[in-house]
């Protein structure tokens, strides 16, 4: 038999999640299901495009267990590109009887088609090879008696006996009746005489749809499309499975003569077309003849007036139209429909136009377009795009003209693995068409090396862009050189370059720049990622700016700018240029001041306006501008009344008053006036606060249970504000003992007093013993902390904190949000060190209850420890809120000790979190079963790194240096967000030089910090590189096995932490950039964050947590992690 008998991969959709589906159609053609002495075969054909997984043919032991066990000889059909077949020669006829399947897979989903073969000389023959019914139908399964024997007839289902008929009652038509068929009734039914065997059995297969007639869906509550020409509605998708010889969304369109398949592209090449081919499709269709043929062997032509598969359809053509046994009614022009019953434009099979065979695209966003004609025009739902892995995409945008429909699809990020054959598919009532095309996805180019700086001047630089070698695909269409000042928040500028050597002009003198190269390949979206960054500094020119610049208001229209005397090194004439501009208005003025002066009055200004001023010293060349100074002119009106006045934390003798003031009114002080209600005006008390930045104050020494009248004023150069109304303050009552005790109670008091004295004596003895024990500890601590009580390290006053730093001019005290001691409910100790403790607590803040972590110092903490602890509060107050730092909730002073409330991180510190993820150590069975070394993915680890970089970028913008950046000082909060913590060593200045001895985190410190005790944001970048190493190594100890002395020796010689085995080169390269010896060559935190965000977008495994052979974790040495 011709090898055309085939399995065709076409398109029944298997619904997956969202808007993506996996699509596959199967057709199995069984040549001569009734086996005689002739050759018979099964052939599978994959049409259209190559499936990702091979198709298979095998024996269906699920349907029939007791069939032959011999393996099938499956070969490639050489007549077609993608086809498999099994051929049985005549001499193997005895081994053919049984059930078979053909299976195909797309994206792991399997579609299986079943069929049977039986002997033509069987005692019974089935009425049909398969029978498809709906749930609830009444079913009669029929077998025709061919041979007469004096034996009982028996019927089996899937090889198991279910029914028998006595020998004298065996009818000519043997039937099995199934009232109200259910899905469990489906299966292979066989009939034979009791003395027969598999060789003499007849088979038929019953298919029961999961839903009732014309219904589909998981709950069978959707109405099926009207499937014509004996098409069957699929109970999972609602789509019509069209019989061989018909196509389209409703199976109305007839194929050309002797063609079949979803798009009618396959052809029966026999002399009589599709005669003797039994076509089997995926359930619930089953098997049938091609259109125009009938009979078990599909070798009988339809009688006149009938057409379609198995000739079950009757022609009822209107207007005297002819009936064709293959296509049905042949309608004249102007008429359409199954019976030519409708007038209208003749339907036209859709065609896909203007789609090239090959498309080259760049990785990134991609918007392919499918354009099709036909009548009726295809709709949005009828056009799809199939990816090489079988994913079906639906249009994101759609439009049509008079002759064409255009579907626009969106792939947000196409990558090289998406290269391959894509298919545009159109399926309408007029037919179906598919057009495969090849997409080649190119990798965007990126230079491997940073550009080199050949020469620099004060306003130019000569650059070798080093565009080759590069990573990715060419050819290169153009090249861009990107550059910008390092410390300015400006967008990157760029110039197009054609040569390798280029000159950058119009640069600012004595400015640090960073630059990189971006390559562009042909095609839309061809701009690659910028390459490595190079930094350089332009030369100086002119004189430095004046020193000691100070800007103060003089009057309502005058500001006074002063500076120290200038002594230029050259004899050239010089002058001071002052630039003044208004913040509120577009008003700018430049003033020239003789070089021998040390001040200038800026006149003709506007009252209550903020100005920005800068200055430089010019000779023949222009000097460098100073930093911007800002000041307000004095006010011309009375200041507005303080706003948001609140009275809180009221006790029997004190209360806290808070307020806010508006900028721009030259407010110099705040006055709080209070008196007992009802007393004379001259009996008030005035509290004058000369620091206008203070916004809260605690009134003390108030009388219990007393009503006070409180007024608050703002004062400026004009006068005091006028309060709109007074505020009432009522203190709480003081708890008192009863004033008089009756004589009858004296005896009771005496008894209780005696018992109390006894208890007091016992308690006193216990305290003395406890004090003696503690005395030993205090003596041990005395030498280290003998000066603790000489001068308090921290002073508190009603929401303000002052640090005694032993400098001539102490800065203004720090103002912090106050928590009431009674609003803190302590729970568990969650962390403890030598001199500090962290407790979990529930606090009440702004009326809301929340979890918090409370930090406090122990009794033996030194003055430096107290100062660092208070410094942490100072830092947190100045930093403000950010999602990637542990934020301050409030603070409380109780009995001379400071209690600091910060966000509670439920997952603890990052170091412990990483080490707990080492599942090979904690749960080896789980690790081996899942082939993983960590419970954390590459994406999660990179998210931790990006969170820390984002927080450190914020700190660097605020000009804060952390000085102790390590995984142990990162906390993991809600939703696994990493937050920077432990600001005890932080400093709010650009460069900090440590002058005192203390514990040092040597393994995380930069070279310049180890050698010179200098700390900058660049030294924090070094520490970040070590933290990144900790993340990748899942909590390993840096330089494990090395002493601190060895580090002091080896780091200046170029030694660095080795690359972890599970680390991608790109991540390790980022670490190495952080460990560059010259601080100014290290990347900024903003650049680090850009690199990490790009890695997260790539979705590549940058940190491999897969369990491979001989896997080992990085070493851990807890003793080495203690600060030196």
Curated annotation (Swiss-Prot):
It holds the Pfam family Ig_Tie2_1. Its EC number is 2.7.10.1. The chain crosses the membrane at residues 749-769. Its main location: membrane. Residues 210-252, 254-299, 301-341 form the EGF-like domain. Changing residue 233 to Y: In GLC3E; enhanced proteasomal degradation. Homodimer. Heterodimer with TIE1. Interacts with ANGPT1, ANGPT2 and ANGPT4. At cell-cell contacts in quiescent cells, forms a signaling complex composed of ANGPT1 plus TEK molecules from two adjoining cells. In the absence of endothelial cell-cell contacts, interaction with ANGPT1 mediates contacts with the extracellular matrix. Interacts with PTPRB; this promotes endothelial cell-cell adhesion. Interacts with DOK2, GRB2, GRB7, GRB14, PIK3R1 and PTPN11/SHP2. Colocalizes with DOK2 at contacts with the extracellular matrix in migrating cells. Interacts (tyrosine phosphorylated) with TNIP2. This is Angiopoietin-1 receptor. It comes from Homo sapiens (Human).
């Amino acid at each position: 038999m011709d090898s055309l008998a085939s399995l065709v991969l076409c398109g029944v959709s298997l619904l997956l999640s969202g808007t993506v589906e996996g699509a596959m159609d199967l057709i199995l053609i069984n040549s001569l299901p009734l086996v005689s002495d002739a050759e018979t075969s099964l052939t599978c054909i994959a049409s259209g495009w190559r499936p990702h997984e091979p198709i298979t043919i095998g024996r269906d032991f699920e349907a029939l267990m007791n069939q032959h066990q011999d393996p099938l000889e499956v070969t490639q059909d050489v007549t077609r590109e993608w086809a498999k077949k099994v051929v049985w020669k005549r001499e193997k006829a005895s081994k053919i009887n049984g059930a078979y399947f053909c299976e195909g897979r797309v994206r792991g989903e399997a579609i299986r088609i079943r069929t049977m073969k039986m002997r033509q000389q069987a005692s019974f023959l089935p009425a049909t090879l398969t029978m498809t019914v709906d749930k609830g139908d009444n079913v009669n399964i029929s077998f025709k008696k061919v041979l007469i024997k004096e034996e009982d007839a028996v019927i089996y289902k899937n090889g198991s006996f279910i029914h028998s008929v006595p020998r004298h009652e065996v009818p000519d038509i043997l039937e099995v009746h199934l009232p109200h068929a259910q899905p469990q009734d489906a299966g292979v039914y066989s009939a034979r005489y009791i003395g027969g065997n598999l060789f003499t059995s007849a088979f038929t297969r019953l298919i029961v749809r999961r839903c009732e007639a014309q219904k589909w869906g998981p709950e069978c509550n959707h109405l099926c499309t009207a499937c014509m020409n004996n098409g069957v509605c699929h109970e999972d998708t609602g789509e019509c499975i069209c019989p061989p010889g018909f196509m389209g969304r409703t199976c109305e369109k007839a194929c050309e003569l002797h063609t079949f398949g979803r798009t009618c592209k396959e052809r029966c090449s026999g002399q009589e077309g599709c005669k003797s081919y039994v076509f089997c499709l995926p359930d619930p269709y089953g098997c049938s003849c091609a259109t125009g043929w009938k009979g078990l062997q599909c070798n009988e032509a339809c009688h006149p007036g009938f057409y379609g598969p198995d000739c079950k359809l009757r022609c009822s053509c209107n207007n005297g139209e002819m009936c064709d046994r293959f296509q049905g009614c042949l309608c004249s022009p102007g008429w359409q429909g199954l019976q030519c019953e409708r007038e209208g434009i003749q339907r036209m099979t859709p065609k896909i136009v203007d789609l090239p065979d090959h498309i080259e695209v760049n990785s990134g966003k991609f918007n392919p377009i499918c354009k099709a004609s036909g009548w009726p025009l295809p709709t949005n739902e009828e056009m799809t795009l199939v990816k090489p892995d079988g994913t079906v995409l639906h249009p994101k945008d759609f439009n049509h003209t008079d002759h064409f429909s255009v579907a626009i699809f969106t792939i947000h990020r196409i990558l090289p693995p998406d290269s391959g054959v894509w298919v545009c598919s159109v399926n309408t009532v007029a037919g179906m068409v598919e057009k495969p095309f090849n997409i080649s996805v190119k990798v965007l180019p990126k230079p491997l090396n940073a550009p080199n700086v050949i020469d620099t001047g004060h306003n130019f630089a000569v650059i070798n862009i080093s565009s080759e070698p590069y990573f990715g695909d060419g050819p290169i269409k153009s090249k861009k050189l990107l550059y910008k000042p390092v410390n300015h928040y400006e967008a990157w500028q760029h110039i197009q370059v054609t040569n390798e050597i280029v000159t950058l002009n119009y640069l600012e003198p004595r400015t640090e720049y960073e630059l990189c190269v971006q390559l562009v390949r042909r095609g839309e979206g061809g701009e690659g990622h910028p390459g490595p960054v190079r930094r350089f500094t332009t030369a100086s020119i002119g004189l430095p700016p004046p020193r000691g610049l100070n800007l103060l208001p003089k009057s309502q229209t005058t500001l006074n700018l002063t500076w120290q005397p200038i002594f230029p090194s050259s004899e050239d004439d010089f002058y001071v240029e002052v630039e003044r501009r208004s913040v509120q208005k577009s008003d700018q003025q430049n003033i020239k001041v003789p070089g021998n002066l040390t001040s200038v009055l800026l006149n003709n200004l506007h009252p209550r306006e903020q100005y920005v001023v800068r200055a430089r010293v010019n000779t023949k060349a222009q000097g460098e501008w100073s930093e911007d100074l800002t000041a307000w002119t004095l006010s011309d009106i009375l200041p507005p009344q303080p706003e948001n006045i609140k009275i809180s934390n009221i006790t029997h003798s004190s209360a806290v008053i808070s307020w806010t003031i508006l900028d721009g009114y030259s407010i110099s002080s705040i006055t709080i006036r209070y008196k007992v209600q009802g007393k004379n005006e001259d009996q008030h008390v005035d509290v004058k606060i000369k620091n206008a930045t203070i916004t809260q104050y605690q009134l003390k020494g108030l009388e219990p249970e007393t009503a006070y009248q409180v007024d608050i004023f703002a004062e400026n150069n004009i006068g005091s504000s006028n309060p709109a109304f007074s505020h009432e303050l009522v203190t709480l009552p003081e708890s008192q003992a009863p004033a008089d005790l009756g004589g009858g109670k004296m005896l009771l008091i005496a008894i209780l007093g005696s018992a109390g004295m006894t208890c007091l004596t016992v308690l006193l003895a216990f305290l003395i013993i406890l004090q003696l024990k503690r005395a030993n500890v205090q003596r041990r601590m005395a030498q280290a902390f003998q000066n603790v009580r000489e001068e308090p390290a921290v002073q508190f006053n009603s929401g303000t904190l002052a640090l005694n730093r032993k400098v001539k001019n102490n800065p203004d005290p720090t103002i912090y949000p106050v928590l009431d001691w009674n609003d803190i409910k302590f729970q568990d100790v969650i962390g403890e060190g030598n001199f500090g403790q962290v407790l979990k607590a529930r606090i009440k803040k702004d009326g809301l209850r929340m979890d918090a972590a409370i930090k406090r110092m122990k009794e033996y903490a030194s003055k430096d420890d107290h100062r660092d602890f208070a410094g942490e509060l100072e830092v947190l107050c100045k930093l403000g809120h950010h999602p990637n730092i542990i934020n301050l909730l409030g603070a409380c002073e109780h009995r001379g000790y400071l209690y600091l409330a910060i966000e509670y991180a439920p997952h603890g510190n990052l170091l412990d979190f990483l080490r707990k993820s080492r599942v090979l150590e904690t749960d080896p069975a789980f690790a081996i079963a899942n082939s993983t070394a960590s419970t954390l993915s590459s994406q999660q680890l990179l998210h931790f790194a990006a969170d820390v970089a984002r927080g450190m970028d914020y700190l660097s913008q605020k000009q804060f240096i952390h000085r102790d950046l390590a995984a142990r000082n990162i906390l993991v909060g809600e939703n696994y967000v990493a937050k920077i913590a432990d600001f005890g060593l932080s400093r709010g200045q650009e460069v900090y030089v440590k002058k005192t001895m203390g514990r040092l985190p040597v393994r995380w410190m930069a070279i310049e910090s180890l050698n010179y005790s200098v700390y900058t944001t660049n030294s924090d970048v070094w520490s970040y590189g070590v933290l990144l190493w900790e993340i990748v190594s899942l909590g390993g100890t840096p330089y494990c096995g090395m002493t601190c002395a060895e580090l002091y020796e080896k780091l200046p010689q170029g030694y660095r932490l080795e690359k972890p085995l599970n680390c991608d080169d790109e991540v390790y390269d980022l670490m190495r950039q952080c460990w560059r010896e010259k601080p100014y060559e290290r990347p900024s935190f903003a650049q680090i964050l850009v690199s990490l965000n790009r890695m997260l977008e790539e979705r590549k495994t940058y940190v491999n947590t897969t369990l491979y052979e001989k896997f080992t974790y990085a070493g851990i040495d807890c003793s080495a992690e203690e600060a030196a």
